[in-house]
Every structure is written in structure tokens, then in C-alpha cells.
């Protein structure tokens, strides 16, 4: 279990590397907006959470945010958001609630006790464009 930002396996497929790059772009953008990135690629059981972060607000008070990052280079097969279906959402929620119930990140790092929400952020490359869906599910 690893939640450290730079600790990704070396044997990644090209698609996985593109996903990693998209997650890095999103993490950078959120950090520039004042968010704290607590962990990337967090494994809880068999499921993975792309980003675990804190949105400091305003307008809302600080929240723990589980971010699902999606990369899509074309809309020919629909919107990237549409790939986060019921099953994927259930897996993300289950993993997040297990982590929250444990009160810590899987690597033992602290997890702030804040209200939680689930966001989807879509990255469209060349040049990078972002669509941020807050409280998406």
C-alpha cells in the first residue's frame, strides 16, 4: 500500500503512464488552488483512489476530497465522466469509507477528520483543459 506521490511502480503500461501524467497535472493544479494533496494512487483492498486531498474552501468549509481523474483525448466514444459508472463509483466509495473508518491513509499517514466528498476531474490534453465536477457522486 502506498500513498506517496512519487512512489509509482516502474512497470507501467503506456496508458497507465498517461493516467499518471494526468493525475500529476491535476495534483499540480489543485495545489496551485491552495489544496493539500495527501496522497496519490492510494490502494485500499483491491481498489485505488487516484487522489486524496483537502479542499480548504471557501465558500464551503474544508473538506476531504476523493478525486477520480479521467483522461480523454477524444470525445468520439463519449465523455470521460461517463466512464465513472455505478460500479466504479461504488468501488471508490467503498475504498474511501474503509480508509475513513480506519482514520488514516493506508501508509499510516494522518487523515484529517473532515466531511468527505467525491469529485471527478477530467483532463483533455494538448493543451491541457480541465473539467472539475465537484460532489459528482
Task: State each model region's role.
Residues 1-40:
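Acidic-basic catalytic patches of nuclease active cores, encompassing PD-(D/E)XK
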Residues 2, 6, 71-126:
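Catalytic cores of nucleic-acid endonucleases
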Residues 30, 49-80, 92:
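Conserved catalytic cores of phosphodiester-cleaving nucleases, focusing on short active-site segments
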Residues 41-45, 110-112:
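A short beta-turn/loop motif at secondary-structure boundaries
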Residues 44-48, 127:
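Short acidic/glycine-enriched loop/turn segments that link adjacent beta-strands
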Residues 47, 63-65, 116-119, 131:
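Protein kinase-like catalytic core scaffold
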Residues 122-137:
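Short, low-complexity, polybasic intrinsically disordered segments
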Amino acid at each position: 500500500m502506498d500513498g506517496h506521490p512519487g512512489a509509482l511502480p516502474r512497470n507501467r503500461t503506456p496508458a497507465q503512464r498517461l493516467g499518471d501524467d494526468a493525475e500529476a497535472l491535476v495534483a499540480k493544479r489543485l495545489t496551485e488552488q491552495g489544496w493539500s494533496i495527501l496522497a496519490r494512487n492510494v490502494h485500499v483492498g483491491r481498489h485505488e483512489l487516484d487522489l486524496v486531498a483537502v479542499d480548504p474552501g471557501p465558500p464551503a468549509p474544508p473538506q476531504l476530497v476523493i478525486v477520480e481523474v479521467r483522461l480523454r483525448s477524444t470525445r468520439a466514444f463519449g465523455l470521460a465522466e461517463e466512464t465513472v459508472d455505478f460500479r466504479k463509483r461504488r468501488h471508490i466509495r467503498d475504498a474511501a469509507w474503509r480508509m475513513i473508518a480506519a482514520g488514516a491513509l493506508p501508509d499510516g499517514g494522518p487523515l484529517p477528520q473532515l466531511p468527505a466528498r467525491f469529485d471527478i476531474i477530467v483532463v483533455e490534453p494538448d493543451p491541457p483543459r480541465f473539467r472539475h465536477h465537484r460532489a459528482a457522486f
